[in-house]
From Swiss-Prot:
Keyword Nucleotide-binding tagged: yes
Family the entry assigns: Belongs to the YajQ family.
Protein name: Nucleotide-binding protein CJA_2652
GO molecular function: nucleotide binding
GO cellular component annotations of the record: cytosol
Pfam families to which the protein is assigned, alphabetical: DUF520
Top-level taxonomy: Bacteria, Pseudomonadati, Pseudomonadota, Gammaproteobacteria, Cellvibrionales
InterPro entries in the record: DUF520, UPF0234-like_C, UPF0234_N, YajQ-like_sf
Keywords: Nucleotide-binding
Length: 160
């Protein structure tokens, strides 16, 4: 029986490259000369630090551009509010990976609502969709791509 998995993954290597490229761009920019501005990454958590909130916003734009160039969807960023400590302004971000229970339930409900001849089941941080025909699965993929669910999704493990 044909099936595929709906997942939300971010490549760690591409994320590291994006953060490193953003750091290089910031160190070379004229308006950041003499400013203590830096990006720090630990697993899927990114912290940006600068002297002013305006610079923090510019750094966020640079990071988003670098992520887009590396093929990472910027909608997976969960950005927290700014924290001020002395001269420094900080902002923490988390790169969301995996499909949480609420989103998985939305995906299953969307598949059932379209009355396609497929079944969707939640398996941890992914959703498995099975059906009798390959065409039904491809139609389901098109439906999920068209839906705005607020999280980037990939479709992998497609089996006949």
């Amino acid at each position: 029986m044909p099936s595929f998995d709906v997942v939300s993954e971010v490549d760690k290597h591409a994320l590291t490259n994006a953060v490193d490229q953003a750091q290089r761009l910031i160190t070379n920019r004229f308006d950041f000369k003499g400013v203590d501005a830096k990006f720090e990454r630990k697993e899927f958590d990114i912290t940006i630090t600068a002297d002013a909130d305006m610079q923090l916003d510019q750094m966020l734009d640079v990071l988003r551009t670098a992520m887009a160039k590396n093929g990472i969807d910027v909608s997976c960023l969960d950005i927290s509010s700014m924290k001020t400590s002395g001269k420094q302004v900080k902002r923490d971000m988390t790169v969301r990976t995996g499909i949480d229970k609420e989103l998985a339930k939305k995906i299953v409900a969307l598949v059932k609502e379209k009355k396609l001849k497929v079944q969707a089941s939640i398996q941890g941080d992914q959703v498995r969709v099975t059906g009798k025909k390959r065409d039904d699965l491809q139609e389901c993929i098109a439906t999920l791509r068209a839906a705005e669910l607020g999280m980037p999704m990939q479709f992998n493990n497609f089996r006949d």
